Design a protein with these regions (language model features):
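Short, structured coil segments at secondary-structure junctions
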Residues: 50, 89, 126-127, 175-176
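Active-site-lining helix/loop region of Rossmann-like oxidoreductase modules
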Residues: 153-217
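NAD(P)+-binding Rossmann beta1-loop-alpha1 motif at the extreme N-terminus of oxidoreductases
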Residues: 1-44
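General beta-strand structural signal in soluble alpha/beta enzymes
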Residues: 54, 130-134, 180-183
Length: 217
């Protein structure tokens, strides 16, 4: 499958690398590929993953069947605008980002909550896209290697389009997730995003980001 991962931070790089390892054709989108490739952290990673193609947001999205948004939440809509609404039309857009506000330091707050979600804002901004929210409730290591945990835990999926959620669920299964919980329509992403404040607190208390939430039935 042709996939575009928008975002070159730790999570974007982890997801892009793992999906390429699984046999997908992956582009990693950035505002300025030349400047990104000049960064020491990215250059070293890119040398280890030559099968992942750096591209502009627009070029990555244009070539993709599925677009994954793995950016700082405050930049998500802007990044997708640069990718181009015409390049998102009819495509599955998997939103992994979170509406975290670090303007007052740590711990962060949420810049959208309760009656809205970042995923819904993305859907409203790009109504022809098929937005699915998932993977936002865990660290990037656990996103791509859930087997690192003795019990991988649960992963949540929200979206209005059943076929788009099926596509996202297929990718989650490839990544090794087994407890995939469909929360319902895209408004259910509000709850998934609101887990982040407690996730951040847990990380501080436990001194590690290598954990996950688990729904016990």
């Amino acid at each position: 499958m042709e996939l575009a991962v928008l975002g070159t931070g730790a999570a974007g790089r982890a997801i892009a690398a793992r999906l390429a390892e699984l046999g997908h054709h992956v582009s990693i989108g950035t505002r300025d590929p030349e400047a990104t490739q000049a960064r020491d952290d990215f250059a070293g990673w890119a040398a280890d993953h030559p099968d992942v193609r750096p591209a502009t947001f627009a070029a990555a999205a244009a070539a993709a069947e599925v677009v994954l948004v793995v950016t700082n939440g405050s930049a998500s809509v802007d990044v997708l605008t640069q990718a181009g609404a015409d390049h998102l039309e009819g495509k599955v857009v998997i939103d992994v980002s979170n509406p975290l506000d670090f303007s007052q330091g740590m711990p962060p707050t949420l810049f959208v909550k309760d009656t809205d979600s970042l995923a819904e804002q993305i859907q409203r901004a790009f109504p022809a896209a098929r937005v699915v929210k998932t993977l936002n409730t865990m660290n990037n290591e656990v996103m791509v290697h859930p087997e690192l945990l003795p019990d991988p835990g649960s992963v949540f999926v929200s979206g209005d389009d059943a076929a788009a959620k099926e596509t996202a669920t297929g990718l989650l299964t490839e990544l090794g997730h087994t407890d995939i919980i469909d929360l319902g329509d895209l408004s259910s992403a509000r709850g998934a995003e609101m887990l982040l404040p407690i996730w951040v607190r847990l990380m501080g208390v436990m001194g590690t980001a290598r954990f996950n939430f688990k729904i016990v039935r």
